[in-house]
C-alpha cells in the first residue's frame, strides 16, 4: 500500500511537471518569437540595470570618500547616517551568519530572474527589473571590502554601505539606493497585480452579464413554439 502511494505521488508530480514544462514552452515561444515585444523587454531590462547600478555605485563611492558620517541632506526629512549593514534590507538579520544573509538576499534575485524570463507585461518587467538589480547591487556591495578614506570604525567586511535615514521616524532603519529601487520595484509589481485583478474582475462580470442562463433560453424557445399567430377577423360582406 505504501509503495503504491509513493508511486501515485511520483506519477502525479511527473504529470504536473510535464504540464508546467509544456505551459512554459508555450509562454516562452509567445514572448521570444515576438520581435517587437522582445526588443522592448530587453530595452527595459538594460535601462533599469544602467540606472540602478550606476546610481548605486556612484553614490557608494561618494559615501566612501565622505569626511563625516552624519549630516542633514534635507533638513527635518532626510539625513546621511553612514553605517555598515551586515544584515539584509533595512538592517534585518543584522547579527546572522553571513552565509544565511547571502542566501536570503539571493532569493528575490533568483525569483526575479524567472519572472523576467516568463513575463509578457511591460509594467511587471520594470518592477521586477528594479527588484532584481537592486538586490544584485546589494550582493555586489557586500562582497566588496573597501576602506573609508576619512572615516574610521565603520566596516565593509560582509557589510552593505547604508546611508539614508528619516530623522522624523523614531529608530528609523538606515538604507541605501538599492533598497530604494527594490521598494519602488515592489510598488510597480503591486500596481500591476491590482490592474490585472481589476481587469479579470471586469471581464468576468461582463461575461456573466452577456451570458444568458440556459433555463431562460429554453423558456424563450418554448414560448416561440407555442406562440399563436394573431387571429384575423372574418370579413363580412353585406348584401345590398
Swiss-Prot record:
UniProt GO MF annotations: aspartic-type endopeptidase activity
Keywords of the record: Aspartyl protease, Cell membrane, Hydrolase, Membrane, Protease, Transmembrane, Transmembrane helix
EC number of this enzyme: 3.4.23.36
Location of this chain's protein in the cell: Cell membrane
Pathway assigned in UniProt: Protein modification; lipoprotein biosynthesis (signal peptide cleavage)
Class in the EC hierarchy, top level: hydrolase
Catalytic activity: Release of signal peptides from bacterial membrane prolipoproteins. Hydrolyzes -Xaa-Yaa-Zaa-|-(S,diacylglyceryl)Cys-, in which Xaa is hydrophobic (preferably Leu), and Yaa (Ala or Ser) and Zaa (Gly or Ala) have small, neutral side chains
GO BP terms: proteolysis
Any GO CC annotation of this UniProt entry: plasma membrane
Mode of membrane association: Multi-pass membrane protein
Annotated active site: 162, 179
Keyword presence, Hydrolase: yes
Membrane-crossing residue ranges in chain numbering: 38-58, 73-93, 98-118, 120-140, 177-197
PANTHER family cross-referenced by the UniProt entry: LIPOPROTEIN SIGNAL PEPTIDASE
Record's function text: This protein specifically catalyzes the removal of signal peptides from prolipoproteins.
Family: Belongs to the peptidase A8 family.
Name of the featured protein: Lipoprotein signal peptidase
Organism: Malacoplasma penetrans (strain HF-2) (Mycoplasma penetrans)
Gene: lspA
Amino acid at each position: 500500500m505504501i509503495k503504491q502511494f509513493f508511486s501515485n505521488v511520483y506519477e502525479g508530480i511527473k504529470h504536473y511537471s510535464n504540464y508546467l514544462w509544456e505551459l512554459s514552452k508555450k509562454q516562452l515561444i509567445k514572448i521570444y518569437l515576438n520581435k517587437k515585444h522582445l526588443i522592448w523587454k530587453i530595452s527595459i531590462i538594460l535601462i533599469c540595470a544602467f540606472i540602478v547600478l550606476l546610481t548605486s555605485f556612484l553614490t557608494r563611492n561618494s559615501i566612501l570618500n565622505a569626511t563625516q558620517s552624519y549630516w542633514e541632506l534635507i533638513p527635518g526629512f532626510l539625513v546621511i547616517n553612514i553605517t555598515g549593514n551586515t544584515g539584509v534590507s533595512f538592517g534585518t538579520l543584522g547579527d546572522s551568519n553571513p552565509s544565511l544573509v547571502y542566501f536570503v538576499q539571493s532569493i528575490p534575485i533568483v525569483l526575479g530572474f524567472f519572472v523576467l524570463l516568463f513575463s509578457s507585461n511591460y509594467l511587471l518587467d520594470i518592477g521586477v527589473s528594479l527588484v532584481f538589480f537592486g538586490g544584485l547591487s546589494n550582493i555586489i556591495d557586500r562582497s566588496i571590502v573597501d576602506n573609508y578614506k576619512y572615516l574610521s570604525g565603520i566596516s565593509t567586511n560582509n557589510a552593505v554601505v547604508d546611508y539614508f535615514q528619516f530623522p522624523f521616524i523614531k529608530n528609523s532603519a538606515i538604507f541605501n539606493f538599492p533598497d530604494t529601487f527594490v521598494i519602488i520595484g515592489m510598488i510597480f509589481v503591486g500596481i500591476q497585480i491590482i490592474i490585472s485583478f481589476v481587469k479579470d474582475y471586469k471581464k468576468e462580470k461582463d461575461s456573466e452579464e452577456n451570458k444568458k442562463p440556459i433555463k431562460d433560453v429554453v423558456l424563450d424557445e418554448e414560448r416561440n413554439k407555442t406562440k399563436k399567430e394573431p387571429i384575423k377577423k372574418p370579413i363580412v360582406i353585406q348584401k345590398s
